């Protein structure tokens, strides 16, 4: 029972991390490079992402896109083996609800890190050498700005575990989060302990991957 629930929760977390990494880093890079009106729009979106609770956002998404427009399923998670398209559609709303606040955090961290890197002396040297701005940003500045972003992603991954408890219950997804709530309500201590062990293992693995990513991105922090 726990293994099948773990697969569902990991699917939700991995999908959310992918969305947060792509959208959050992308918006942060755009905001640091362009500024102006675009920066204000992205700032507004980030404030909204931080201000809106994920359970409220989940209810609004279900009411709008599932109940009113019937675009996405309201509840549950379709098995990938039965329908890959249905599986993907059933992930969209819970991932959006879970990713809104982390996207805002990653975007702000990326923007600040990129702004600091783009003011560095080596960036002026690269510009003087004739490299295009796109090449400077994507190949050099982003890599140097990625270390603090990876740190934030590691912290957010741990906080996402708490978010899954709420989102899984809002969308009736059969994962570890909804199982934990049911077990607490039923005073089922062995199941609660099992869920806690799985969550602890996830945190340990996440920290391990963050350390590995640090070593890949910066040779200075590699353990000899």
Question: PLM features: residue spans?
Answer:
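Alpha-helical transmembrane segments of integral membrane proteins
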Residues: 2-38, 82-224
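Membrane-water interface segments at transmembrane-helix boundaries in multipass membrane proteins
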Residues: 43-108
């Amino acid at each position: 029972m726990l293994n099948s629930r773990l697969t569902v929760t990991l699917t939700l977390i991995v999908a959310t991390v992918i969305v947060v990494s792509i959208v959050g880093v992308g918006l942060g890079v755009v905001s640091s490079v362009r500024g102006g009106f675009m920066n204000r729009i992205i700032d507004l979106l980030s404030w909204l992402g931080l201000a809106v609770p994920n359970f409220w956002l989940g209810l609004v998404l279900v009411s709008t896109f599932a109940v009113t427009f019937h675009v996405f399923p309201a509840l549950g998670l379709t098995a990938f083996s039965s329908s890959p398209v249905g599986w993907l559609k059933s992930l969209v709303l819970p991932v959006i609800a879970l990713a809104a606040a982390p996207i805002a955090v990653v975007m702000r961290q990326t923007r600040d890190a990129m702004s600091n890197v783009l003011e560095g002396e080596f960036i002026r040297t690269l510009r003087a050498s004739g490299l295009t701005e796109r090449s400077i940003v994507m190949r050099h500045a982003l890599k140097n700005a990625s270390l603090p972003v990876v740190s934030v992603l590691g912290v957010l991954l741990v906080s996402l575990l708490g978010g899954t408890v709420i989102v899984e219950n809002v969308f009736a997804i059969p994962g570890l989060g909804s199982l934990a709530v049911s077990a607490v309500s039923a005073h089922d201590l062995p199941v609660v302990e099992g869920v806690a062990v799985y969550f602890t293992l996830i945190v340990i693995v996440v920290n391990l991957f963050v350390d590995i990513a640090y070593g890949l991105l910066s040779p200075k922090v590699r353990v000899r």
